[in-house]
Amino acid sequence: VTRAGAISTPAEGHPDPFRTAELRRAVLTAWGASAARFREDANAEEDLALGGHRDRLIIELAQNAADAATRAGVPCRLRLTYHEAADDAPAVLAAANTGAPLDAAAVESLSTLRASAKRDDGPAAVGRFGVGFAAVLAVSDEPAVVSHGRGVRWSLTEARAMAAEVPGLADELRRRDGHVPLLRLPLPAEGGAPDAYDTVVVLPMRDGAAQDLTARLLAAVDDALLLALPNLAEVVVDTPAGVRTLTRRTVEGGDVLVEDSAAAAPTRWRLVTEGGALAPELLADRPVEERLRPVWSVAWAVPVAADGSPAAPRTAPVVHAPTPTDEPLGLPALLLASLPLDPTRR
């Protein structure tokens, strides 16, 4: 199921449980009525995929997985399996997770920029705005998401063909060398997640550059990912070089122990966390999505030795909000805070 060829398209006339045909029809109609709308969608998708979210593939996959587990009320387990290219099949990254399965609201969210279905998930949810999934476009032109036998996929080739049939888009397509906002045009898919998981995101690699980026991001997985996403209990990174497992658990005294099979010993993290409600006037000039979650939280985390003395963290020296931003942090600790961000997580 984690190979690209295991994701299939239902035969014509079969049920379309996520109403992808309706979503495509609405988008194509809007593009036909206004080439400016097509241009707006294309620019927005490119900005996210090639700009702010280009290097956030693993973080966004983990964040979506953690939020799905939060919705289901279960601990999140995430397995990232990388298959090398074989014969005529491209290299593939498969991200399988436990948690709430794919539903129609999630499909619409994935296919609609800045229209997240997570607004009612409560303060434990991390995802915002519905833009994070665009990170998959940094490495793949054929992403798919399936759970419990049904799913959704996207295809640049098929999206290009659909857009070519829309009157009035010929000039735009030529100007963009045939690139179209493919996430706006979902297609039905069939398949299932590996045993013991609920959902899998399948990403056939576009080219060698995509493979290199994915390998670098997989190698960069560290303790900060599990500390930033408290419901993320386990991450397994399975590549041709071997299998690496990271887990987190709370131990006596409230410290968090992160065990990494690639490390010589576990790391014990001491956390101090504060949080509360935000006064409405502090959010008056913030986007609606933020005003619907009027809470704040701040956590400092420091690795400690057996005698309790602090050590310098080996995590990236940047502010986490709660996942990494590009804001540098010059203090020898890990900062996780609900700071306001723009859509590119700056």
Which positions does each model-derived feature cover?
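A generic alpha-to-beta junction signature in SAM-dependent methyltransferases
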Residues: 69-72, 114
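A conserved short beta-strand within the histidine kinase catalytic ATPase domain
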Residues: 74-83
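Flexible ATP-lid and adjacent glycine-rich G1/G2 motifs of the Bergerat
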Residues: 92-165
